[in-house]
């Protein structure tokens, strides 16, 4: 992917949610919400602090993250839909 986010922004590819319930019921596309989990595919250099220093981001490429339903801005790059958001919009990193 040919995009490099600036400053404290990250590029996230949404992870598909499970479309079948535990009971085996298949959920149609029209009934599913957009996933709120994704994988970080690019990160900026860091947040510029008031004193001019750059603080490195806590997330890194490959991290699986959680974010709000309305977080970020959807864009299309190389035919692929991704989200651009600030690191502060990420709620957590999935471990393990």
Curated annotation (Swiss-Prot):
Single GO MF annotation: unfolded protein binding
Gene: groES
Keyword Cytoplasm set for record: yes
Localization terms from the record: Cytoplasm
Keyword Chaperone: yes
PROSITE patterns linked: CHAPERONINS_CPN10
Matches recorded under InterPro entries: Chaperonin_GroES, Chaperonin_GroES_sf, Chaprnonin_Cpn10_CS, GroES-like_sf
Family: Belongs to the GroES chaperonin family.
Assembly and interaction partners: Heptamer of 7 subunits arranged in a ring. Interacts with the chaperonin GroEL.
Main localization, broad class: cytoplasm
Lineage top rank: taxon: Bacteria
Role of this protein: Together with the chaperonin GroEL, plays an essential role in assisting protein folding. The GroEL-GroES system forms a nano-cage that allows encapsulation of the non-native substrate proteins and provides a physical environment optimized to promote and accelerate protein folding. GroES binds to the apical surface of the GroEL ring, thereby capping the opening of the GroEL channel.
Keywords: Chaperone, Cytoplasm
Name recorded for this polypeptide: Co-chaperonin GroES
Classification via HAMAP family: CH10
GO CC annotations, alphabetized: cytoplasm
BP-aspect Gene Ontology terms: chaperone cofactor-dependent protein refolding
């Amino acid at each position: 992917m040919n995009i490099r986010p600036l400053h404290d922004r990250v590029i996230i590819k949404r992870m598909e949610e499970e479309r079948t319930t535990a009971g085996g019921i298949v959920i149609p596309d029209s009934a599913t919400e957009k996933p709120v989990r994704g994988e970080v595919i690019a990160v900026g250099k860091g947040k510029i602090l008031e004193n001019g220093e750059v603080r490195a981001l806590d997330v890194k490429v490959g991290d699986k993250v959680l974010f709000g339903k309305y977080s970020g801005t959807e864009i299309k790059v190389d035919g692929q839909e991704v989200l651009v958001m600030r690191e502060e919009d990420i709620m957590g990193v999935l471990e393990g």
